[in-house]
Amino acid sequence: MSTIAQHGTAEHKMPREHFLNAAYTVKSWFLTMDHKRVGLLYLFSICFFFLIGGTFASLIRLELATPEADLMEADQYNVAFSMHGIVMIFFFLIPSIPAVFGNFIMPLMIGAKDVAFPKLNLTSWYLFIFGGSFGVLTTLLGGVDTGWTFYTPFSSTYSNSNVILAGMAAFIAGFSSILTGSVSYTHLRAHET
């Protein structure tokens, strides 16, 4: 029977302040530089947009329950169908994995204490919210009926005037995803010993 000798054991000290015991004020959440909190901010906002897209999907399914146009007219159905696609693609599907898991889990997996550019990381979330507010404003102003792809004949000739606003919302959300993806994790990777 052998025994294992423990040499140089160091006690692990928890940091004084981290995302679990830091102040829980609104200011501390909206001005945070902690990558875990930014990941949670992305999670909460993406869940909000998922609920909006799910509401449009429920309206579509309720309309398709019977052959008659019970709930919406044809134009309103096209708007609900398009807004469901726009919200679910640009504000749920594209940012969900890189923004939430990339901010919360990736730095922990590679051993980094934080992301390389924490202010840029928080700025990307603010841009995502800014683009999402354009998407919600598009919905409140009547939506678009072009589909989520914004094909040219539908978006130029046969559409209402909200296509530019919806396109700006998608562009700003896409730019936010570029900023989220450009946050470099490898510069702060833990060194191998």
Regions found by a protein language model. Give the residues of each.
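Extramembrane terminal tails and long inter-domain/linker segments of multi-pass membrane proteins
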Residues: 1-36, 68-72, 152
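Compositionally biased, intrinsically disordered low-complexity segments enriched
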Residues: 8-9, 37, 86, 193
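Helix-boundary and loop/linker segments of multi-pass membrane transporters
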Residues: 30-32, 80-81, 158-160
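Conserved small/polar residues in nucleotide/adenosyl-binding loops
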Residues: 186-193
